[in-house]
Amino acid sequence: MTFFDDIAIGGITELGSHTFTAEAIKRFARAYDPQPFHVDEEAAAAGLFGALTASGWHTTAVMMKLIAAAGAADKMDCARHGPSPGFDDLRWLKPVFAGDTLTYRAIVTGKRESRSRPGWGVVSSRFEAHNQAGEKAMDVTVHGLVEHPTA
């Protein structure tokens, strides 16, 4: 179990990889982001990216799934790793096409004691996803509450 004091700035967590299939891209987009370049291969071919692309929200949802899986693998006690008070600077930098595989990681960029919740700290991490060519496709800074029993 990891507490606030155990977390090192600069620490890196490899979260895993995910391959985006055409069917999964369309299924997610039909439910949550039904733009033509996410749901219609012909329309996408004639569009800005020249092919079907995953919704940025899809790439971000996969990131959250991998975060949850990493927490479960470490048997993280969610009561000790609280909710996220938010995120900053979400960027979708490269289109994600059907067949692309993104590999996700988190880099701890800062931490501080919570001003509003005694016994808790706020840890900030930069999450990145790189495609199979090594290009950064998305990134975001996420802030999370972590129990700080010495505070």
Where are these regions (language model features)?
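HotDog/MaoC-like acyl-thioester-processing domains
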Residues: 1-9, 14, 92-151
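Short, charged low-complexity intrinsically disordered segments located at boundaries
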Residues: 55-62, 91-99
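Hot-dog-fold acyl-thioester-processing enzymes
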Residues: 1-85, 150-151
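Short beta-strand or tight-loop elements
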Residues: 83-88, 104
